[in-house]
Amino acid sequence: MEILLFNTRDELLRVSLKHVVYFESDGNYTHIHFSNGAKATLLYSLSNMEHLIDEKLRGKVQPFIRIGKKYIVN
């Protein structure tokens, strides 16, 4: 199971990539939409998020694909 860790202002957020449906860009923020309907917002650009995903999944099959400037979908 691949997990990304993010320090937010209030907590350490663990994001399991298998539960992510898509990432959505909103300027310098990225909204993460999960399969259970939950949503998290992080102060990361979509380009930074794409780089983190690529680094985490290096050498593995990558189920995520970038769609234009606004989305990365699973």
Task: Put a short name on every predicted segment.
Residues 1-74:
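Basic, polyanion-interacting recognition surfaces, primarily
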